[in-house]
């Protein structure tokens, strides 16, 4: 498990148990490296904070009573229009974002899965501005986080072993 931020911010109180900003507890999220048969990867441009306007892997928060696999399939469908086969877990990590005052503004525990598109047409859905198929060897224009690039690399290695 790794973390996206250093620093030891303190809890800010949050608006409720379900508030994403200044949460009382970490929020469980799911994400996916959706790899096509020709090896391209699905990326989405985030429409809301955190990461608004930035490219990332598709995903979102888990709903109460939802399994991790069902949650990732739902999020991919909502954000990209694709129906996917959910494969193995690629990694589990946290994303902790601290505000200028040192308080934890966002704290997510994220489970990323390798997925394969089964049907549907790629299009930007809810919570995203755009969705693209990208060459995983040419990701520089998307300015992905180091963690996103690492997860893509790990998923490609897993996909290569599964063939």
Q: Where does each model-flagged region fall?
A:
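A conserved beta-turn-beta hairpin within the catalytic core of GNAT-like acetyltransferases
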Residues: 50-53
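NUDIX/MutT-family hydrolases
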Residues: 114, 123-155
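The catalytic Nudix box helix
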Residues: 57-90, 113
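Acidic, metal-coordinating catalytic segment for phosphate/diphosphate chemistry
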Residues: 2-31, 103
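Active-site-adjacent beta-strand/loop module that shapes the phosphate/pyrophosphate-binding cleft
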Residues: 94-121
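Hydrophobic "anchor" residues
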Residues: 40-41, 122
């Amino acid at each position: 498990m790794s973390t996206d931020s250093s620093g030891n911010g303190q809890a800010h109180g949050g608006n409720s148990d379900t508030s994403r900003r200044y949460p009382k507890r970490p929020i469980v999220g799911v994400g996916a490296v959706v790899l096509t048969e020709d090896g391209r990867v699905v990326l989405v441009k985030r429409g809301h904070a955190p990461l608004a306007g930035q490219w990332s892997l598709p995903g979102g928060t888990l709903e109460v009573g939802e399994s991790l696999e069902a949650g990732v399939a739902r999020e991919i469908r909502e954000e990209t229009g694709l129906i996917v086969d959910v494969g193995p877990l690629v990694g589990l990590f946290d994303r902790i974002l601290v505000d200028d005052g040192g308080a934890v503004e966002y704290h997510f525990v994220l489970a990323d899965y390798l997925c394969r598109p089964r049907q549907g047409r790629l299009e930007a859905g809810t919570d995203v501005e755009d969705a693209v198929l990208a060459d995983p060897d040419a990701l520089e224009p998307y300015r992905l986080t180091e963690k996103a690039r690492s997860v893509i690399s790990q998923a490609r290695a897993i996909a290569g072993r599964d063939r």
